[in-house]
C-alpha cells in the first residue's frame, strides 16, 4: 500500500515541475480517479488549472448537477455541452474498440478547444495502473490511454496517479478531504454508458442504460460492491400486458475486487434480484427482460465492452 502523505507531496511536486508556469486542463468525469487527479493538480498549481467537465450524453443520471455542486470551489470549472457531437461521431459504429477510440478522440478535441481558449499547454489525466496494464496488454483500450488520438495538440500529458490501484486512489481522495460521494463512489468507465451498450449507441439505448444503472447502484449499495452496473446487451421477446414485444435485454453485474485486475461476481439474494428486474422493466416499456451475470474476471472483464 502506498504511503499516502508521501505520495501526495511527490505527486504535487511532479505536477508543478512538469507544468511550471504554464497552464493545464484536466477532464472531470465525476469518478474518483479524475476527481482525485483534479484535486492534486489544483493544490499543485491552483488557478493555472482549468477543470473541464464534458457532458458527453453518456453519463450517469444526475452526473452534471453533481459535478457543479462538488467542484464549485474551483473558479476555473468549465462545463462543456457536447452531447450532440459525441452521438453524431458514434452514429453507426458497433465495434467496441472503435467506439472507445472515437470517444477518446472527441474528448481530446473538446479539451483542445478549451485549452486554446485558456492558453493551456498541458493535459492532466486520472490514468491509474490497471488502465495501463489493460491497454498495454491489448485487453481493451481506455479512453485516456489507448484511446488517445495519434496527434494531440498539447505539449505534454501529466498522469500523477499512473502507478496507483483503485483502493490507493480512494485513500488519496480521503486524505485530500474529498467528499464521500467522490472518494467512495463506484468506478465508472471514462467512455461512460457507451461501453455498457452492446453495438451502436442510440438515444433510446442510453435512456435504458442510464435508468437501469441508477436502479442497480441504488439497490446494491448495501452490498458494498467494488462495482455494480447494468448493460444493454441486445433484444429478446417479452410480454407487456397482452402483447408480445421485442424489447431490450438488460444485464446486471455486481463484483467484488481489490483493484479491478481480478474480480468475483457477488451472490445476491433472490428478493434483491427480483426488485431490480421489476424496477428496470417497469421504468422503460421497451425492456423485455433482465438477467444477472455470474461470470468472474477472468474469464470476463468487468465492463461489457
Swiss-Prot record:
UniProt pathway annotation: Purine metabolism; GMP biosynthesis; GMP from XMP (L-Gln route): step 1/1
Keywords assigned: ATP-binding, GMP biosynthesis, Ligase, Nucleotide-binding, Purine biosynthesis
Catalytic reaction(s) noted: XMP + L-glutamine + ATP + H2O = GMP + L-glutamate + AMP + diphosphate + 2 H(+)
UniProt GO molecular function: ATP binding; GMP synthase activity
InterPro entries: GMP_synth_C, GMP_synthase_B, GMPS_ATP_PPase_dom, NAD/GMP_synthase, Rossmann-like_a/b/a_fold
Enzyme Commission number(s) of this protein: 6.3.5.2
Residue pairs linked by disulfide bridges in the UniProt entry: none
Pfam families the UniProt entry points to: GMP_synt_C, NAD_synthase
Identification of the protein by name: GMP synthase [glutamine-hydrolyzing] subunit B
Lineage of origin: Archaea, Methanobacteriati, Methanobacteriota, Stenosarchaea group, Halobacteria
Gene: guaAB
